[in-house]
Regions:
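Phosphate-rich cofactor/ligand-interacting catalytic cores and adjacent structured alpha/beta frameworks
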Residues: 1-82, 88-89, 126-259, 263, ...
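Short glycine/serine- and small hydrophobic-enriched flexible loop segments
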Residues: 120-128, 279-286
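Short, structured motif recognition centered on aromatic/hydrophobic residues
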Residues: 118, 205-212, 274-281
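Short, electropositive, low-hydrophobicity segments enriched in small/polar residues
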Residues: 118, 124, 182, 273-274
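Long, hydrophobic/aromatic-enriched structural stretches that serve as scaffold segments
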Residues: 71-126
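Short, hydrophobic/aliphatic alpha-helical segments
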Residues: 91-107, 250-264, 282
Length: 305
């Protein structure tokens, strides 16, 4: 049974009233809202470290705070430089500095490398202030991503190793394509669940599961291979078809998936990064300068109540 998603609606241009610092803070809040969202199968949340042995909720918060100034620097560059290869080179250099700051804040753990790429591009594009519609920001971010980075390190990253073995394009391919899993999965799902009067927590969990069900997550492929990816995609789909977050059957299916991912040491980190991107673009479209964390007041129990 296919899960039908609404088509992303077209809206008039939205002009920016936020400066680079405010956009960077919104990106930080998106990262914090993602990690605070509970319960997430295999991921760090308020229950614990998920499938990670080197991360925690506090470390994820610290990482988000450490990289926020670099998002602001990217935005400042976008406002002062032409939108061309020079900016691409500058933003890439800032991104590598952000990775160093992240590693220092987390004692060497990779908390947000993918998010630095994803949200860095989106903050840079949004800082132009031309149009804050999600599709327009994603289009500009994709244009920038596709420009060559002359200083790109020659060492293979985990994502590049996975791409070579499985053909999955990962965060780089997502950006090149204009963030389709954000525009056509995350955002429409979040809107649809709000229209169904879901709690904000459940709406965000629905968005995450829909992304997990479709994304060729290179974080999953690196840890669990093709079999692990199939488990994640089927498990997320099964949870949605069972009723999703907000239903006893759906939450029990999420629990089963969570337990399976912990056993296999699999964490869908790529999907988590795209959920954060979803929350960031959603806030911009809604004209919000803050992303509320509803996790403490809207806890999902995995159907145990």
């Amino acid at each position: 049974m296919a899960i039908v998603l609404p088509i992303l609606r077209q809206v008039a241009p939205i002009r920016s009233v936020l400066d680079a610092g405010q956009l960077a803070e919104l990106a930080r809040q998106a990262l914090v809202a993602e990690v605070e969202l509970t319960p997430k199968p295999g991921l760090v949340d308020r229950r614990g470290a998920g499938a990670h042995s080197d991360l925690s909720l506090d470390l994820m918060r610290q990482s988000a705070a450490a990289i926020a100034p670099y998002f602001e620097a990217m935005g400042d560059s976008a406002q002062s430089m032409p939108f061309d290869r020079g900016l691409r080179t500058e933003v890439a250099a800032i991104g590598r500095a952000a990775e160093s700051a992240m590693l220092q804040a987390t004692n060497g753990s990779n908390a947000h490398k993918g998010a630095i790429w994803v949200l860095g591009l989106l903050v840079t594009a949004a800082s132009r202030g031309i149009d804050l519609n999600p599709a327009a920001i994603a289009q500009d971010a994709a244009f920038l991503a596709r420009l060559p980075d002359r200083a790109q390190p020659q060492l293979l990253s985990h994502g590049e190793m996975v791409r070579a073995r499985y053909g999955a394009t990962g965060a780089r391919g997502e950006a090149f394509a204009g963030f389709p899993h954000v525009l056509h999965v995350g955002l429409p799902t979040l809107r649809a669940e709000r229209n169904r009067a879901r709690t904000e927590t459940n709406g965000r969990l629905w968005a995450l599961l829909n992304i997990m069900a479709r994304l060729e997550d290179t974080c999953v492929l690196y840890r669990g291979g093709a079999e692990g990816l199939a488990i994640v995609q089927k498990g997320a789909s099964d949870a949605l078809l069972a009723g999703g977050p907000g239903s006893v059957a759906g939450e029990l299916a999420m629990l089963r998936l969570d337990q399976e991912l912990l056993i296999r040491n699999i964490s869908p980190g790529g999907a988590a990064d795209l959920l954060a991107a979803t929350l960031f673009l959603d806030a911009l479209e809604q004209g919000q300068n803050a992303i509320e964390d509803n996790s403490l007041s809207e806890e999902v129990s995995y159907g145990t109540d």
